[in-house]
Every structure is written in C-alpha cells, then in structure tokens.
C-alpha cells in the first residue's frame, strides 16, 4: 500500500511523519516522540531486522495497523553507530516546538542526517583511521575525484589519468561513502563499494561547483587555491560540498580551503602494490603484521591517521623528506622522545574535537579535552625551542593562552556527558546563572526545614517531604496516620501504603524552584552556545596547530622506531638506482624468533634487472618486498632497516606477487596475473621500481616461459625499469648473457639427507637447483609420495634427450641464429603489409581480387 496516498485518512501526527519521510525517502527516519525515536512502516521493519529490536504496531492509520519500532533517545548513539557501520544513513527528526503551546502535533524538523561518510561523533568513528567521503566524476575516459574528511575539514581534489589510476586512488582512500553522477559510465570501477550514492547531473555542473566553493571560502575566484584548471576535480568537489551541506544542515566553517593533489607529487602505488606490500592491511584483511603495525606507535589518534596517510602517499619532494629526517635526527640526538610523548599524548584527538566545535556538536567533555590539549602547548613549545631545526613547528603551533583561560573559567573539571543535563558551566563564570542555581540548590535545605516544621506542628511522625518528576513536590503521610492530615492539606496522590498531599506554600515554592531550574538550564545552554562563537574565530589557527602537533607526533614516533629498531637515515641521489647495504624486511624481522638475515640490493642504470632464482621458502618474495618497503619508507621521511641506503628518484612502485582467482569478476588466477602484468608494462618507466614474482605460472610450461622471457626482455630493453624478477624458469638465467643491464642473483639452500636448510642469503649467479621435492617433504607431503616423486624425477631426467646444459646452449643458439625480437621497432611483416596497402588502388579491384589480396596481407602478418 502506498501510505502517501489519501493523506487525509491519516492522523495529524502520521501526516506530519509522512511529510518528513517524503523529504528523505531512501534513508531511515528517526522521529522523536518524547523519550524515544520512533520508526514506522518499512523503516520500522528494516530497523528491527538490522538492530535486533522489537517490531510492534501503533494503532491504525488509514484503516491499517502501523508497523513501529523505537529506540530510547538517551541510547541512540549506540544504535546509530551500528547502522552507520552497516552503511545506512539516518535522518534525525527532533521536536522543536513547545508541546504546551501546540494545538496539533508538536512542530518537528530534520536537524541532521547521519551518513557513514559525514559522521563526526567519536562513538561512530574508527579512532585511528580516516573516515572519508568521495565524489567521482567522469567525462569520456577522464576522471575527477574529490575527497572530504568531515572530521578535519581536509578537502582535496585530483584528476586520475586513467581508470587504473582511479581504481588505485579509491583503494587507497577506502571511502565510507562514494558519490557518483547518474550518468557515470564505468560502473565496474565503483560498484563493489559500500555507501554508493547516486547523485543528479546538475550537482556536478562546473558553474554550480565554482559558485558553491567560492561561497564556502568567501572568495571571488579559486585561483588562490591553484585549482581553477582542474575542471573535472572541481565538478566532483561541487557535488561533494553540496552533499555535506545537505546532510549537516549547518555551516561548515572548518572546511576553509581546497587542495589539488598532482599526480607527480607522490610515488604512485597501484591497487595490487598496496595489497601485496601489506601497508596497512594484510592479505587476510586484518591489520596485524603490516608496515603500519610496525611503524605506528603514535601516542595520538590524529598522529596515527596522519602516518597512515604518509604511508599510502609517499612524497617525491626531496627537500621535505630531508626536513623530516633532520627533525627525527634532532629528536634522537637531543633525547626528546620520552620528553615529548607524554605531553603529546595529553593533546589527544584535537583534530576531530575541532571539527565538532565547528559543527557546534561538541559535547562538554570535548571542550575539557580541548582545554587539556591547549594546556600542553606551552610545554611542548618550550621543548621545541631547544633547536633551530624545530623553528617551523614552533611557529605553526601558535599561542592559545586566552582560549585556555576561557575554557578554564567556563567549564567545570568533570562535566556531565550532555549539556542538556546542566551542571557544565563553572561557578563564577556568569552571575545570573549563579543566582538561578542558588535558588534551585537551596531547595534541599528548604525541604528539610519544612519537613521538621510540619512534623512538629501536626504531630505526625511518618510525615516526609519529597519530589518526583511526575507530581513535583509533595508531603507524604502513611495510610495509618493519613486521617490526621490538617484541612489545608490537599490530596495529590494515593499509594498502597501512603497518601501524598500538597499545601499552598509548597506549591508556590515548587513553581519558583522549577522556574529556577528551567531558567538555569536555558541560560546554561545559551552560555555554552556562546562559547562556540568565541572559539570559531580562532578555528584556522587551531586547525594549523592540530595538524602540526599531529606531524610532531608522527616524527617523534618515527624517531622512537628508528632508535628502538636500529634504523638508519637513507640518502637520496639524483641518479637512478636503489642501493641498500644489509637491508631487512621491517615486518618479517619483528615476527621471526631467530635473527633476520640481512641482504644487499644494488640496482642502477647499468644493472637495472635482477633475475632471482632459488627454492620456494628461500626468501625471494621477502627480499623483493623488503626492497620496496625500504624505498617507500625512505620516501615518507622515515629511517629504514638497513646499514645504509642510497635511493634515486622513484616515480612508481609496482608489484606482481602472488595471485588468486577473482571469482566475483569471473577472472582466473592467470587472468588476474596477466592484467596486473599488463598494467606494469603500460605504466612503468625508467624511474619505476618493479617487483615480479613467478610470472607465467598459471598456464602451460612453454606459454609461461615465453611470457616470462618476453616480459623480462621488455622491462630490460624498452622500459629500463629497476626490476627484481623472481622466477622458477631456470632458462631465464641466460638473459644476462644477452641483455645489457641484467644480472643473476640467487638464494641458496643446503640439503643433508632428507632435510633442507634455507640460507636466506642473496648471492651473485643463478641457483643450481630448485629443491622442490625437499620443500614438499618439509611441508608434510607423505614420505612415500615424495619417494615416488624422486623416482619419477630420475626417470624424466633419464628420458630427456638433452641435458640442462644442452637446453640452455640451444636457447643461446636460437637467439643468436634467429636474432632477438626487436621490441622497439615495427615487425618486418607489418612493414611489408603497409607497403602493399600504400601501392593499392581499391577501385581497380574486383570483389574476387580484393578477397585474394586480403589473404596475401594476412600471410604477411
């Protein structure tokens, strides 16, 4: 049944509900009724299922019972948290009218919309990870992307250069909500994300976006932000800001600027690389044994979030990286880690508190925590003034003595959770409030005196004076003595064992006290709101201080990690290459019980592709990953696990390590592998670091070997990328003899009887054997199966007409006699076909001749 039809059949209250519901038909509506938020019809059914609450009925409307569910208003945050985690959005409808003055239903209004991407309440947010809302816009094969962190006001746009770059960015951002235009073409890029929101085309119009952004920032144009040429990014930003305003229903003063992220500012990491390197999430989807789990010992949540952003966006600005290194070195040399961290810990999550202040949703305890944060600043600055290396940090933190004094005077030490409960504003802050409170607080003494006086005058020893929220003040007498009540006692309530009365004097005092309590609460709320007015003019400076303190927390944390884990400062070079002496895997070395075997790597323009051979479990993947992680750590400004490291310019890091079926997209392991490899071959360049592990395993031996050979040759000759190429195809070890810039390295193992010991040390040259059967035995394959495999291996080797050496010699001969495929030039057949076409006059050919000519061309290709 469509409940919106024939509204006159519904009660006035239900008509009001349906009108409000029509404003937001696609999201749940929490409709305030007294001490509950009620949901009706389909919302009630959905909420009952999601929240595991009772589904009941509320009378009838239009002749039908109304499904209903409800949650208590004082416990609503827990229910909202669960719904937000499930990807639901909720419109909060409050009573804004006075029930005493309302003839019909109390006036109600939707005051905010809680969505997964725009929440700012700490109970609804993951503490140590960003909560982002993203908008994406597409024109043909070009994209615009806008990102907003409602909890900090950080607003950024970018223009991914292709679909693969967009995919990588979305994976990095992991948005809680994703807005897209209703005519978005490449839905396969975004359809698997939770929190998808389809938006109308007009919200992405450039003129609308520019107007909205200028109004937000109070500017005439956007040139001052350097974003005016990023047309597609601005289109996405306009939609995103419109959505933020629509959901928050209030000003957004903490969104004070917009930043354009240029693709060349950061090292580009595609989705496969982020996954394979296990930066903040392991391959199983958890957070254990990741790079972040080792590096992140930050003492503030905002520092932890910033460090994760650094990890996912390594920068290429060498001067900034050296500044970070210098600060880390200075913190270590001056022994400031233990001095700074206790004060930084007290700063807490200042970033998100400021967002709630800006949105005017900050609770009393938010303001006391902000006060505590401001209290730490003078001490932190006093520590930083010890070195000129800290000058920029010192200046950006600012001074907030006046704001600290204001909050110290205004808010008590341990306020209640909510302002509506009163008792938040400190005594002495406002004289009028103190007067109302004195009147209200004097009630206890007055009631004690009245009880003594009335008990003495009436001679009733069971007489008591009390109060409850329903009936107000009363005089209670037991049933056995109720007949002794004086004539001026007016009966107010009868209980099983007592009677309750009211007298004119008590009624007069009740009116006076209730008025005082009401006036006190109203004035306190007014004073609390006025605090926001006094804080907001300082919001920009406070946000800068918050960001600076976050960075100081990250740098102090990285100093602690460097000192604790024996890391060194890497050097940067203008020459292409990666040279690491005795590098270690930052995560694996923390997990291993025995000492980690450190290994060197030396990649440069003369030696840019290493063919890595050796047994499974020998450490090939660890060796490759540690090279990428050390490089990435250097480019976030961190010290690295090595004896020394010299890193040249890097623009991208690619990995092709491991694969599994992508069942959701109907792609086999081999298809996933080839897709990732194709992306590398299209995108990598001379400044790219490329890790390739066991390419070609998912098909037949000859197909796989051919593909692996061709990929290695393309990387070595055409792309000249810095490449670590692990393989079990022993045939590839002849490549260094034929390709300049290519070398063999291997990880060895020792066999003793049926046992095997992995050396984990990288050595020059190719491996002598694969040790596959020894690894199988180590894995627990039954001994008889391994024994049978050894027999089969011996038979196969005897049946082989050529020795391994002869096969390798044949490979060399084939390449020498036939010549290598020139990957940089057009094939001869294609050139001949083009020459024939150039000489052809199509008008001179009959249909039969044309068909014959087509066959000739086909033979040439």
Curated annotation (Swiss-Prot):
<keyword id="KW-0234">DNA repair</keyword>
<dbReference type="InterPro" id="IPR007696">
    <property type="entry name" value="DNA_mismatch_repair_MutS_core"/>
</dbReference>
<protein>
    <recommendedName>
        <fullName>DNA mismatch repair protein MutS</fullName>
    </recommendedName>
</protein>
<dbReference type="Pfam" id="PF05190">
    <property type="entry name" value="MutS_IV"/>
</dbReference>
<keyword id="KW-0227">DNA damage</keyword>
<dbReference type="InterPro" id="IPR017261">
    <property type="entry name" value="DNA_mismatch_repair_MutS/MSH"/>
</dbReference>
<dbReference type="InterPro" id="IPR000432">
    <property type="entry name" value="DNA_mismatch_repair_MutS_C"/>
</dbReference>
<dbReference type="InterPro" id="IPR036678">
    <property type="entry name" value="MutS_con_dom_sf"/>
</dbReference>
<dbReference type="Pfam" id="PF05192">
    <property type="entry name" value="MutS_III"/>
</dbReference>
<dbReference type="InterPro" id="IPR007695">
    <property type="entry name" value="DNA_mismatch_repair_MutS-lik_N"/>
</dbReference>
<keyword id="KW-0067">ATP-binding</keyword>
<dbReference type="InterPro" id="IPR036187">
    <property type="entry name" value="DNA_mismatch_repair_MutS_sf"/>
</dbReference>
<dbReference type="InterPro" id="IPR045076">
    <property type="entry name" value="MutS"/>
</dbReference>
<dbReference type="Pfam" id="PF05188">
    <property type="entry name" value="MutS_II"/>
</dbReference>
<dbReference type="InterPro" id="IPR027417">
    <property type="entry name" value="P-loop_NTPase"/>
</dbReference>
<comment type="similarity">
    <text>Belongs to the DNA mismatch repair MutS family.</text>
</comment>
<feature type="binding site">
    <location>
        <begin position="614"/>
        <end position="621"/>
    </location>
    <ligand>
        <name>ATP</name>
    </ligand>
</feature>
<dbReference type="GO" id="GO:0006298">
    <property type="term" value="P:mismatch repair"/>
</dbReference>
<keyword id="KW-0238">DNA-binding</keyword>
<dbReference type="InterPro" id="IPR016151">
    <property type="entry name" value="DNA_mismatch_repair_MutS_N"/>
</dbReference>
<dbReference type="InterPro" id="IPR007861">
    <property type="entry name" value="DNA_mismatch_repair_MutS_clamp"/>
</dbReference>
<dbReference type="InterPro" id="IPR007860">
    <property type="entry name" value="DNA_mmatch_repair_MutS_con_dom"/>
</dbReference>
<dbReference type="Pfam" id="PF00488">
    <property type="entry name" value="MutS_V"/>
</dbReference>
<dbReference type="GO" id="GO:0003684">
    <property type="term" value="F:damaged DNA binding"/>
</dbReference>
<dbReference type="GO" id="GO:0140664">
    <property type="term" value="F:ATP-dependent DNA damage sensor activity"/>
</dbReference>
<dbReference type="InterPro" id="IPR005748">
    <property type="entry name" value="DNA_mismatch_repair_MutS"/>
</dbReference>
<dbReference type="Pfam" id="PF01624">
    <property type="entry name" value="MutS_I"/>
</dbReference>
<dbReference type="GO" id="GO:0005524">
    <property type="term" value="F:ATP binding"/>
</dbReference>
<dbReference type="GO" id="GO:0030983">
    <property type="term" value="F:mismatched DNA binding"/>
</dbReference>
<comment type="function">
    <text>This protein is involved in the repair of mismatches in DNA. It is possible that it carries out the mismatch recognition step. This protein has a weak ATPase activity.</text>
</comment>
<keyword id="KW-0547">Nucleotide-binding</keyword>
<dbReference type="GO" id="GO:0005829">
    <property type="term" value="C:cytosol"/>
</dbReference>
